[in-house]
Amino acid sequence: MNLHEYQAKQLFAEFGLPVPEGYACDTPQEAFEAAGRISTAKKVVKCQVHAGGRGKAGGVELHDTKEGVKEFAQKWLGKNLVTYQTDANGQPVTKILVEEASNIANELYLGAVVDRATRKVVFMASTEGGVEIEKVAEETPELIHKAAIDPLVGPQAYQGRELAFKLGLQGDQIKQFVKIFMGLGEMFTQYDLALLEINPLVITGEGNLLCLDGKINIDSNALYRQPKLREMHDPSQEDKREAHAAQWELNYVALDGNVGCMVNGAGLAMGTMDIVNLHGGKPANFLDVGGGATKERVAEAFKIILSDDNVKAVLVNIFGGIVRCDMIAEGIIGAVKEVGVSVPVVVRLEGTNADLGRKVLAESGLDIIAAESLTDAAQKVVAAAEGK
């Protein structure tokens, strides 16, 4: 689960990290009033969406007057912001962050992520703030400095000092950086984070450190024990189909192809997408129905897949390990009848009772195309999607 910038800064402030004075606003009038409470001559206004690239898309502006701030809010609230990280429809803007402008002398990067290679939380710091860390890692990896956190003892002040030295900080800046580092380390563990970034972490004209932006991603598997963070969830930023899938414990990711895929098992689902692509098709989604592929879940999976108007054919690829293929076949038949599927459906069954499952499908009287192998299934569904 992702947080908005204003929510990330609220958490930063909770742990004593320096953030600009700012207010999240729901209406143009609130934005106008918030601008009046900010003492700096210039105010920064930012659209709050779960996507980067807001500045280049016009979603971040600098204004001298309260009226200018209000006009910005009127322009964007209720609209969609399209950036290079969103799809063509963009993300809806339901809040505007109005905050004081900062006097920036230099920009740094500070972030933390769960590193599966070391099985530790790893902090990353760089002098190349304000740009994507992935770009820095690709072009100048030597400019990224790391500190792995021992889970038994947590972040240590000496690690923060080492990073501060490598960033070229001096004097009181080192103490400020260590405080930020320790606060983020505590926050990462306490709130079950998967990733956090301050980009940029700026050095102001007065020589102080300031968290100018914030990005936080929470481990969704831990949300059951994070009631405070659950309340910060913004469903408007999620794909409606993905949200629907989550309610049924289906793993769904929307893509831009025309072949719907329904598979049990994440690895098999990825392999299915690969072979569809290999035979000239384009997957419209990733969908893993998991081990409990009941009639109800299969029906919901069909509904989700077919809610995408781009889908011209559906490939159902099931390996019967724990579940029996004949039961899956009955679920598919029931789901097709209930949903009223109007596009070609190709089904490949393998594993426990696969022959019986294929027989059940053949005797159903429905227009379901049986496939003998994964290659056969991919070829048939690609042809069906092309109307052949």
Curated annotation (Swiss-Prot):
CC cofactor: Mg(2+)
Cofactor binding, note field: Binds 1 Mg(2+) ion per subunit.
One Gene Ontology CC term in the entry: succinate-CoA ligase complex
Catalytic reactions of this protein: succinate + ATP + CoA = succinyl-CoA + ADP + phosphate; GTP + succinate + CoA = succinyl-CoA + GDP + phosphate
Entry keyword set: ATP-binding, Ligase, Magnesium, Metal-binding, Nucleotide-binding, Tricarboxylic acid cycle
Assigned EC number: 6.2.1.5
Biological pathway: Carbohydrate metabolism; tricarboxylic acid cycle; succinate from succinyl-CoA (ligase route): step 1/1
UniProt family annotation: Belongs to the succinate/malate CoA ligase beta subunit family.
Protein name stated in the entry: Succinate--CoA ligase [ADP-forming] subunit beta
Organism this protein belongs to: Vibrio vulnificus (strain CMCP6)
Gene name for this UniProt entry: sucC
